[in-house]
């Protein structure tokens, strides 16, 4: 049987970031409560960044490493996002153009809140496993932006949003799926999926979200349990404690993952409290490192955790990683795969940690300028030209490699420019 899974994976965690402890102090938040979020930094989208630029900048190093023949075998491009820029035209059309991909390629977009990345990934994996086009590859790009602008006439933030703001991130993860899954070989058929209608969080308007944070937590925990129980039915003998050497979770913020892990260890694995913290540090913490520096990037959040797990974990032998994906509304899935020492070595060549280290650190004054909507491009903008010098100094921090930015919108058509 043919293998399928991740041949390469890269993260783009933004051009700029904010220290979230500085934000908490500036907003006069309860720092004890804030520390439970387990967050350090959040990526902040600049006015001339959008889900297209994030997606292209994540995928370009993967594409550049391919030969022309390999690049031409990308026959499926799926973008996964809840930050779409048009009701009809998908992000994939722009991304396809700026990556210079073969025109004999299916391209489209999927949406189901934070589950979208897994939805796209599973479609790609099954395309490869189907062998309808032997040797083909698929490119899956999950790209999302939390860009919540203060409504006109109201500067006050609700308490709920004040604590959600520090974890709201921006970024993209690009995943190349094919028959040579050096980085992460999927366990075929080892999937537990679970979904139902619930009004926990949603985006009824383009630049904000609505919902019930308590209900969202309860739904997340319910799905975490039910997806694994379904996985267990399909994989006899699977054990939450022993089958997986690592666990990667959809990560809105680290504290939520820690709570979910604790609940699963008590309820499903029947582990005593004394052993849970050690297990968390060993199997889960490696996957939180990048998430703590980027924030919640919705459809891409699980893959950010997976990339972090592979980069930061110890893979002296092949090890199995269990993955939990959750998207509000809701749909969820638990699945697994294998990463080898060679896979970790391959994954580390993308230098994700170095990329995160080189981002521009925003001051609170600069962040507030962006947060209050100065120069931000709202959904449905017909014409605009972007000012790359809005915050002096940022563009100098991007000179390491060519990077794509949004230059203008002309009669709704987005035009981008490479800058190095």
From Swiss-Prot:
Subcellular location: Cytoplasm
UniProt keyword terms in alphabetical order: Antibiotic biosynthesis, Cytoplasm, Transferase
GO BP field: acetyl-CoA metabolic process; antibiotic biosynthetic process
SUPFAM superfamilies registered for this protein in UniProt: Thiolase-like (SSF53901)
Record flagged with keyword Isomerase: no
InterPro entries: HMG_CoA_synt_C_dom, HMG_CoA_synth_N, Thiolase-like
Class in the EC hierarchy, top level: transferase
Summary of the function given for this chain in its UniProt record: Involved in some intermediate steps for the synthesis of the antibiotic polyketide bacillaene which is involved in secondary metabolism. It catalyzes the aldol condensation between the acetyl group attached to the acyl-carrier-protein AcpK (Ac-AcpK) and a beta-ketothioester polyketide intermediate linked to one of the consecutive thiolation domains of PksL.
Gene3D superfamilies on file: 3.40.47.10
Name this polypeptide is given: Polyketide biosynthesis 3-hydroxy-3-methylglutaryl-ACP synthase PksG
Pathway entry: Antibiotic biosynthesis; bacillaene biosynthesis
Catalytic activity, EC: 2.3.3.-
Keyword Transferase belongs to the record: yes
GO CC aspect terms: cytoplasm
Pfam family, one: HMG_CoA_synt_C
GO molecular function, one term: hydroxymethylglutaryl-CoA synthase activity
Domain of life, source organism: Bacteria
Stored CDD domains: init_cond_enzymes (cd00827)
Active site: 82 (proton donor/acceptor), 114 (acyl-thioester intermediate), 250 (proton donor/acceptor)
Family label: Belongs to the thiolase-like superfamily. HMG-CoA synthase family.
Reaction(s) catalysed (UniProt annotation): 3-oxobutanoyl-[ACP] + acetyl-[ACP] + H2O = (3S)-hydroxy-3-methylglutaryl-[ACP] + holo-[ACP] + H(+)
């Amino acid at each position: 049987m043919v293998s399928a899974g991740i041949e390469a994976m890269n993260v783009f965690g933004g051009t700029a970031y904010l220290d979230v402890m500085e934000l908490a102090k500036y907003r006069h938040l309860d720092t004890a409560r804030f520390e439970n979020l387990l967050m350090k930094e959040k990526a902040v989208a600049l006015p001339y960044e959008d889900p297209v630029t994030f997606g292209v900048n994540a995928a370009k190093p993967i594409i550049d490493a391919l030969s022309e023949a390999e690049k031409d075998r990308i026959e499926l491009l799926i973008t996964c996002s809840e930050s779409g820029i048009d009701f009809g035209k998908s992000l994939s059309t722009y991304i396809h153009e700026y990556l210079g991909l073969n025109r004999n390629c299916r391209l489209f977009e999927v949406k189901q809140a934070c589950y979208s990345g897994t939805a796209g990934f599973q479609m790609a994996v099954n395309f490869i496993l189907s062998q309808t086009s032997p040797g083909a590859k698929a490119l899956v790009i999950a790209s999302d932006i939390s860009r919540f602008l203060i409504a006109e006439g109201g500067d006050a933030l609700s308490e709920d949003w004040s604590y959600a703001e520090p974890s709201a991130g921006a970024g993209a993860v690009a995943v190349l799926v094919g028959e040579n899954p050096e980085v992460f070989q999927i366990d075929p058929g080892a999937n537990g999926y679970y979904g139902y209608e619930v009004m926990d969080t949603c985006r009824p308007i383009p630049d904000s979200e609505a919902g019930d944070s308590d209900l969202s937590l309860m739904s997340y925990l319910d799905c975490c349990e039910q997806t694994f129980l379904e996985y267990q039915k399909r994989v006899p003998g699977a054990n939450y404690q022993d089958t997986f050497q690592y666990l990667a979770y959809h990560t809105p913020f680290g504290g939520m993952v820690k709570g979910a892990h604790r609940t699963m260890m008590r309820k499903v694995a029947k582990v005593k409290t004394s052993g849970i913290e050690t297990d968390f540090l060993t199997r889960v913490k490696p996957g939180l490192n990048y998430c703590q520096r980027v924030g919640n990037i919705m459809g891409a959040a699980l893959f950010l955790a997976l990339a972090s797990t592979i980069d930061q974990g110890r893979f002296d032998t092949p090890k199995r990683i269990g993955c939990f994906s959750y998207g509000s509304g809701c749909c969820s899935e638990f699945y697994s795969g294998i990463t080898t020492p060679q896979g970790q070595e391959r994954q580390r060549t993308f230098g994700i940690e170095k990329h995160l280290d080189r981002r521009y650190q925003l001051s609170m004054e600069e962040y507030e300028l962006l947060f209050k909507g100065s120069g931000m491009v709202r959904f449905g903008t017909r014409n605009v030209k972007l000012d790359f010098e809005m915050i002096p100094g940022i563009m100098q921090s991007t000179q390491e490699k060519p990077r794509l930015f949004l230059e203008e919108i002309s009669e709704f058509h987005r035009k981008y420019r490479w800058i190095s």
